[in-house]
Amino acid sequence: MKFLDETKVYIRSGDGGAGAVSFRREKFIEFGGPDGGDGGRGGDVWVEAVNGLNTLIDFRYQQHFKAKTGTHGMGRNRTGAKGGDVTLKVPVGTQIFEEDNETLIVDMVAEGQRYRLAAGGNGGFGNAHFKSSTNQAPSWANPGLEGEEKTIWLRLKLIADAGLVGLPNAGKSTFLAACTRARPKIANYPFTTLHPNLGVATIDEKEFIIADIPGLIEGAHEGVGIGDRFLGHVERTRVLLHLVSAQEEDVAKAYKTVKHELEAYGGGLEEKPQIVALSQIDVLDEEELKAKAKALGKACGTPPLLISAVTNKGMTEALRALRSVIAAAKAGEEEA
């Protein structure tokens, strides 16, 4: 499935229906008077957050959305029907911005959340509305009001419990594939992962969602590489798993590079709870493993987890560590 996390959309609510000019026509009633009904309201444009979506790709193929015009008023004081609404269905985690792509309109953070982006125009008054003591038979009615027209931006920030960060080839996609049913593309070259992947991990009968984003390189916060574009997807996570490949010559430098990029990006990423793990340890002998684990522990200030997604070594411990932080964060949110 293709991934799209930002797109521009054009929306227009429906125009109001016109009021009717009509007069009562009945046998034996010579001066029946006006009976033109009001026009119906135009349809609204709504946005709704739904489960089962994790990309905005559908909006690549349709960018224009217009609600229906209200039905015109009719004789016998009949009001026109309201125009049909249009609903944009977006993934949970989608933010809606004004045309400047900076002013936030609404953040769709819960399944079923709905928000009206544009209200339909009011229907026009029929001529019955204008009857007065000085004008018993008005021969005019109002047209309906025009609907709203605007350009908006949709920006997706995936909602996951844990986020995987690290340099390209740190083993993030292999980790995700080993502990979830997600099947990201895996190969031994940088930037194999070109867009975020989500997976559901289960440990001790408890589930949580993991997001894997493309690898970060030095200068990522300034737009170097592709990882910076997707850092927003781990802003909402409760914990980061920072993977450092055992194949790196200098594991301390690799750790510090990513740490610096997270700090430079901002968005609260540098303050987020972080678990550091030395990954791909199956490629090292015992002596090399001890040396690199010691160097990484010195750089990050705590002994790193030692894992291999290929042999499954350390995977259970890593998942339990993530689950523990997530559970503590959720408990804190509930108390607040």
Swiss-Prot record:
Any one biological process term the GO annotation gives: ribosome biogenesis
CC per GO annotation: cytoplasm
SUPFAM superfamilies, A to Z: Obg GTP-binding protein N-terminal domain (SSF82051), P-loop containing nucleoside triphosphate hydrolases (SSF52540)
Cofactor: Mg(2+)
UniProt keyword annotations, A-Z: Cytoplasm, GTP-binding, Hydrolase, Magnesium, Metal-binding, Nucleotide-binding
PROSITE patterns noted in UniProt: G_OBG, GTP1_OBG, OBG
Residues that bind GTP: 166-173, 191-195, 212-215, 279-282, 308-310
GO MF entry, a single one: GTP binding
Alphabetical list of Gene3D superfamilies matching this protein: GTP1/OBG domain, P-loop containing nucleotide triphosphate hydrolases
Cited Pfam families: GTP1_OBG (PF01018), MMR_HSR1 (PF01926)
CDD domains the record matches: Obg (cd01898)
Enzyme Commission number(s): 3.6.5.-
Domain OBG-type G per the UniProt entry, residue ranges: 160-327
Enzyme class: hydrolase
InterPro entries: G_OBG, GTP-bd, GTP-bd_Obg/CgtA, GTP1-OBG_CS, GTP1_OBG_dom, GTP1_OBG_dom_sf, OBG_GTPase, P-loop_NTPase
Positions contributing to Mg(2+) binding: 173, 193
Cellular localization per UniProt: Cytoplasm
Domain spans labelled Obg: 1-159
Primary location class: cytoplasm
PANTHER family per UniProt: DEVELOPMENTALLY REGULATED GTP-BINDING PROTEIN-RELATED, MITOCHONDRIAL RIBOSOME-ASSOCIATED GTPASE 2
Family per record: Belongs to the TRAFAC class OBG-HflX-like GTPase superfamily. OBG GTPase family.
Protein role: An essential GTPase which binds GTP, GDP and possibly (p)ppGpp with moderate affinity, with high nucleotide exchange rates and a fairly low GTP hydrolysis rate. Plays a role in control of the cell cycle, stress response, ribosome biogenesis and in those bacteria that undergo differentiation, in morphogenesis control.
Known partners and oligomeric status: Monomer.
Protein name: GTPase Obg
UniProt lineage: Bacteria, Pseudomonadati, Pseudomonadota, Alphaproteobacteria, Hyphomicrobiales
